UniProtKB/Swiss-Prot annotation:
This is UPF0060 membrane protein AZC_0909. Belongs to the UPF0060 family. It is a multi-pass membrane protein. It comes from the Bacteria. PANTHER family: UPF0060 MEMBRANE PROTEIN YNFA.
Length: 106
């Protein structure tokens, strides 16, 4: 099952992007960039391990997981609680990701 890999990839991507955000937008130390780059490399490596017959399909399905994980990060790390529109948007995206992941293909 690809779901645990998608979740780990999302955590790695968000952590890596947040490191850059912290340096550029919040004035954080440039030392944040090293773990940020490592996290982004881990993200790419993890995404290559998911079960998919095409890279584009893996990336598209991952998008729904990424959106949900991003909202979780926003709440847990940034202290901003998602509102009902965030939740609705995430639900729609997850439904789309499920169609991509679980559709019967012949």
């Amino acid at each position: 099952m690809s779901l645990p890999l998608f979740a780990l990839a999302a955590l790695a991507e968000i952590a890596g992007c947040f490191a850059f955000w912290h340096v550029v937008r919040a004035g954080g130390s440039p030392l944040w960039l090293a773990p940020g780059v490592l996290s982004l490399v881990a993200f790419a490596a993890l995404l290559t391990q998911v079960e998919a017959d095409a890279a584009g399909r893996a990336f598209a399905a991952y998008g729904g997981i990424y959106i949900l994980a991003s909202l979780g990060w926003m709440w847990a790390a940034e202290g901003v609680r998602p509102d009902r529109f965030d939740a609705l948007g995430a639900a729609i995206c997850l439904a789309g990701a499920c169609v991509i992941l679980f559709a019967p293909r012949g």
